[in-house]
Every structure is written in C-alpha cells, then in structure tokens.
Amino acid sequence: KFNISEKDGLKYSKISGDTNKIHIDNLTGYNSIFGEKICHGTLVLIKILEKIDLLKIINDKNLFYINFNFAKYFKYQHPISVIKNKNIFNIYQEDQKKLTINFSLKKKIDFSNFKKKHSIVTFYPKKNKKISDIFIILNNLSKYVGTVYPGRFSIISEINIYFNKHSYLFDNKLKIISKKIDPRLPIIENQLTFKNYLVQFKSLERPIVKNNKKIDNKLLRNKINKIKYNALIIGGSQGIGKDVLNILSDNHNIKKFVTYNKNKISKKSNTIYPIKFNVFDKINTLDKIIEANSPLKIYYFASPKIYFDNTLPLSIKKNYKFIFLNFPSLLLERYKNKNITLFYPSTSNILENRNSYYSKIKKNAEHKIKKICLKYRIPFEIVRFPALNSRQSVSLTNPSPTSLNEYLKKYPKIINKIF
C-alpha cells in the first residue's frame, strides 16, 4: 500500500495484476487528510506517467471505472438529486480544458428504500480513449455530506478506482496527489495548477503511528480501589465509564452492580454483577435493580452520541430528550438519599451549532441537573471535554492523539471530583 506524506487517512492499493485498484478510504473520519474538510471539496489526481493507448490494451468498457461507496448514514440526508447531478465529479486532462472521459451510471438507485448498510454506485467510461493524465475533481461535496461540522459521517465513505486484469501495464506508472479545494471558489479550468501539489509516494508500507501514548490510569485506579461499599455503575460502554468498569474488576473488596448494554467486561471477577439495563428503559426497571441489590452509592456515566443538526426523526429526538434531560433528573430526584455521584459528560465543540436541537437539549439538561444537585447537595461534575470531532465520551485512558494534551491537563481534576 502506498502512503501519503500528509495526515493519515488515504489508502492506496498498488496497481498490479493482483491488486488492481486505487482505494481511497476513511472519507468519514475526522482525523484524516479528507475528514472534516471533505465537505469543502477534494481533488484527487491520477497522474499516468506514460501515455497509454487503451484501445491497444483491450476493447473493454470496464477497463477503467470509478466506484463510490455510500455510507449507511446517507439515508438521513434525503439526497434526491445527488446521483442525478452531473457535477459530483469531473474528469480533466492535463491541459485542464478538455473533458477526457464522460461517466454514466451502471444502474439507477431507489433511495426510497435505502436499508442496506452500504450502497455501491459504479461509474463507467462511455468510450475508450487515449488518455494521459487524469484529474478527478469531487465537486461541491457540501451538498452531499449534509453538514459542515466534523464528526458527522460523510455520504461518500470510500472511492475505488478499478482497472481490469491488464492493469499490470499501469504498474509503476502512476502518481497520485490530493488537494483540498476552497468551497468559496468556483472550480474552473484555469484555477487548477496541479504542479504545485504533487505528492510522491516513497514507501509501499504504511508508517507506524508513533503518537499512541496512553494516559496512565494509576490515579483513577487508586481512587476506585479505595471504594469499600457496594456500588451501582450506570453506563460503561464508552469513555470513563468503561475505564471504571474494567478497573472495578480488579477490586475484590466490594460487590459491584454494573449496568450494561453492549459493552463487555474485559476481566472476570466474582464481585462484578452485570445487570442488563438500557437508559431508554423506564425508571421502574432501575427501581427493581436498586431494591434487589441495595447499592450504597450510584455512579452515572451514560452519554449518548452527538448529533449536530435539526434533521433527526421525531422518535430519535424524543429518545435523546429523555436520555439527556429526563433520565438523569429522575435518577437524582428518585435516589437523592442513595449517595449518588453524577458524572455528566457534556462536550463543548467549537464547531457545534448552538441552535441545533441537540445543543438546546444539552443546555437545558445541564441547567436542570445542576439545579437538582445543588438543591439536594448531591456531588456532581458536568465535564466539558476538549473540542472533539467524535462522540463526547472518548476514553480518558486512550484518547485520540489530537486531544491527548488537553486530557492530560484535565484528567486529575476530573477524577478527583468524581471520586
């Protein structure tokens, strides 16, 4: 696989008889060369270093084609005219004036019944032509990703550029570059100066990521291991809840009653009692759990995923309103004498739409929780993590490299307040 010298995020398969495609992946990731900037438009250049007469190779329309893989989140965008729009991409020759190859859809797609995880759309060249350098320009992608905020999944999750069995003729004759395009400028022929953006691939192996340092959870472990009473942990599938759950497995002094949804307990322990409980369940379910197990302390770590826009279906909105606003409040009111410690993760994202449905619910929830906690003198901590481009509850013991320094600063303070 080739590697690009910029940020990680692109995967290229070597063009050869065995691996006959160029693979561009991680278009949905926030920590990649495309990532959060994909909605600004991206240029991908396939530079064929030697002119090749395709007609002399094989008279096959499938010799060279492009495959777009649409992510499952595409269905939330309602893209009625995405495929019909011919400006999804353009193919330019090196002189930037002549359209080299026109592409057409292999088949029509019915978006009204979009239930598959992925939908693959393939474009074939209509005619075989003698080609030299090909420039593939993804135009105005902000129309198709649904939002300009990082963290949302893009519609186009990957792009594959395929060659047929004769692709060995392309071996060692290709050079690939990429360039982010300013969305405020129209894409016109004389605007593109590709020579300044060439990137030479120097290695066939992907480099080892050196910035994989993990925060030492010694402080967290020491705090939790001092707990000498039965405790009920609500949450734990992600983030600090998961860390607490795993560390509790080492503490054999007390009984731990841990609610879970899909998470797995990494270490077996005779004092860990998993209780299947979903925060979408009614509060009565939790009543039975608490009555049966009599925990002396309750920790709340639940943290739902982030959505940035106002396009959520009504059913999802109701669920998120419940999990953010109603459930923590009910929990505090109901069990205020049970020595609850509330840990409420609430990300502050600098690119978040402050007028979105999610933001309003989160703000109301924080205000209501703070009011109840102060009224009953319940220890609580509303944590605003550093601005992340993913869900708000990234593990404190294994944060993303982009937020590592911020977590190192905030980590001791957060843990001391929780425990």
What are these regions (language model features)?
Residues 1-4, 58-121, 157, 161-235:
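HotDog/MaoC-like acyl-thioester-processing domains
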Residues 1-37, 104-134:
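Catalytic strand-loop segment that frames the active site of acyl-thioester-processing enzymes
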Residues 234, 295-305, 344:
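Rossmann-fold scaffold of SDR-type NAD(P)-dependent oxidoreductases
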Residues 234-247:
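N-terminal Rossmann NAD(P)H-binding glycine-rich loop of SDR-like oxidoreductase domains
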Residues 252-266:
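Conserved glycine-rich Rossmann-like NAD(P)H-binding loop of the short-chain dehydrogenase/reductase
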Residues 269-284:
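Rossmann-fold cofactor-recognition segment
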Residues 304-309, 313-323, 339-374, 384-393:
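Catalytic loop of short-chain dehydrogenase/reductase
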Residues 382-383, 394-419:
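C-terminal helical subdomain
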